[in-house]
């Protein structure tokens, strides 16, 4: 069964109810890139980079940057870094060791979907564009400084 979700901020694959790590495989197009043992992974847009991804240690990305950021959630590793991919590439996320149908996929935190080790989550740039109305002009770097750096 194939379902399509659209999100503005992030797509998350995470462990379910059990307090155990999951093994997640990340592919970019057909190429294996990263295997991580963690509570899960966050794939964020630049808009979502200042939310869950940042809280998990991911970078803050300028909204003009056309990319995805993959950040692991509580990885079982002393050395772990986020990876930035161009949004022109499709990413594939698969939970390797979940046979209990206990992992969860969410897009922007909406309607959690249970997934298992046979499920491959494909993440790609949506053909839809979000059009936002600005009440006043903003400067990303000034807002970043005020909200995050000066806290």
Task: Go through each PLM region and give its residues.
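Catalytic phosphate-donor-binding core of small-molecule kinases
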Residues: 1-39, 50-151
């Amino acid at each position: 069964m194939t379902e399509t979700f659209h999100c503005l901020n992030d797509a998350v694959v995470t462990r379910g109810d059990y307090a155990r790590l999951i093994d997640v495989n990340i592919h970019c197009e057909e190429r294996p890139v990263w295997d991580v043992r963690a509570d899960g992974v966050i794939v964020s847009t630049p808009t979502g980079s200042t939310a869950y991804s940042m809280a998990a240690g991911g970078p803050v990305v300028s909204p003009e940057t056309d990319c995805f950021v993959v950040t692991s959630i509580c990885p079982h590793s002393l050395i772990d870094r986020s990876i930035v991919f161009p949004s022109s590439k499709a990413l594939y996320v698969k939970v390797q060791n979940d046979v209990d149908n206990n992992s969860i996929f969410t897009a922007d935190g909406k309607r959690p979907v249970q997934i298992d080790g046979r499920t491959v989550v494909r993440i790609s740039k949506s053909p839809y564009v979000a059009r936002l109305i600005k009440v006043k002009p903003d400067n990303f770097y000034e807002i970043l400084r005020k909200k995050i750096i000066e806290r």
